Amino acid sequence: MKQYLELCRRIVDEGHWVENERTGKRCLTVINADLTYDVANNQFPLVTTRKSFWKAAVAELLGYIRGYDNAEDFRKLGTKTWDANANLNDAWLNNPYRKGDDDMGRVYGVQGRAWAKPDGGHIDQLRKIVDDLTRGVDDRGEILNFYNPGEFHMGCLRPCMYSHHFSLLGDTLYLNSTQRSCDVPLGLNFNMVQVYVFLAIMAQITGKKPGQAFHKIVNAHIYEDQLALMRDVQLKREPLQAPTFHINPEIKSLEDLETWVTLDDFWVEGYEHHDPIQYPFSV
């Protein structure tokens, strides 16, 4: 929580106003933030100064792992995070590549599980990483990359957190995740959970011990219609004791994650939090 609150305060105190063309709103912005999560010691980075819906964050990550491209599939997992971008984004609604209601296009997990090759085939990036790590192999390129400029026009949104680089030191697994842009009041609590959980679950299914997860954010911002709530409400609250995160030990493979795993296979103990804050969302 400390590093999260320090970033929020830094944006409020030192941020520069930037006009965002996509949303038509101004953002108070800083460049570069580095967060570290101690997965080895189960220091779960869940926000306590407002209620954080961690299950939706895990459900979204699970959808990425499965390569989903439809908001309905994400809803079935337990999150509505893609409803607006799939169905309320004017540019996407008028895009000839959109297949209909709830279609997201070739975003995030689609790129991770089926990156298009010039010859017409596909690359399953995640499968390759899991196979390598399971065998104890780190070729210095165990990178899951969602950022494919050649197909931006085929999706409803460019990826924000676009790269996850796994590294082995002995039998300990590390993760470096890079995020080009972050809506800090709304998105960062999700993203912190996802980086932490991604390392934890990948270590479990590859038979490795989790180490630290390193989370780099390039453009961290607070939208102008979120600023008062962040400055005058959330930042005035005292953080509470961090909870612990748990994964069903029966999850042992990528195939398990692709088939039978649900949100019931993840749980949090000791989560105390302040009241929710309804931050505005910008499509």
Swiss-Prot record:
A GO CC term assigned to this protein in UniProt: cytosol
Keyword line: Cytoplasm, Methyltransferase, Nucleotide biosynthesis, Transferase
Active site, UniProt feature: 160 (nucleophile)
Binding of (6R)-5,10-methylene-5,6,7,8-tetrahydrofolate, residues: 183, 282
InterPro entries the record matches: Thymidate_synth/dCMP_Mease, Thymidate_synth/dCMP_Mease_dom, Thymidate_synth/dCMP_Mease_sf, Thymidylate_synthase, Thymidylate_synthase_AS
Pathway annotation from the record: Pyrimidine metabolism; dTTP biosynthesis
UniProt-annotated binding residues for dUMP: 22, 180-183, 191, 221-223
Subcellular location: Cytoplasm
Enzyme class: transferase
Gene3D superfamilies: Thymidylate synthase/dCMP hydroxymethylase domain (3.30.572.10)
Catalysed reaction, written as an equation: dUMP + (6R)-5,10-methylene-5,6,7,8-tetrahydrofolate = 7,8-dihydrofolate + dTMP
Origin superkingdom: Bacteria
Pfam families linked to this entry: Thymidylat_synt (PF00303)
EC numbers, comma separated: 2.1.1.45
Record-level GO BP terms: dTMP biosynthetic process; dTTP biosynthetic process; methylation
GO MF term list: thymidylate synthase activity
Function: Catalyzes the reductive methylation of 2'-deoxyuridine-5'-monophosphate (dUMP) to 2'-deoxythymidine-5'-monophosphate (dTMP) while utilizing 5,10-methylenetetrahydrofolate (mTHF) as the methyl donor and reductant in the reaction, yielding dihydrofolate (DHF) as a by-product. This enzymatic reaction provides an intracellular de novo source of dTMP, an essential precursor for DNA biosynthesis.
Similarity field: Belongs to the thymidylate synthase family. Bacterial-type ThyA subfamily.
Subunit description: Homodimer.
Name by which UniProt lists this protein: Thymidylate synthase
Gene source species: Vibrio vulnificus (strain YJ016)
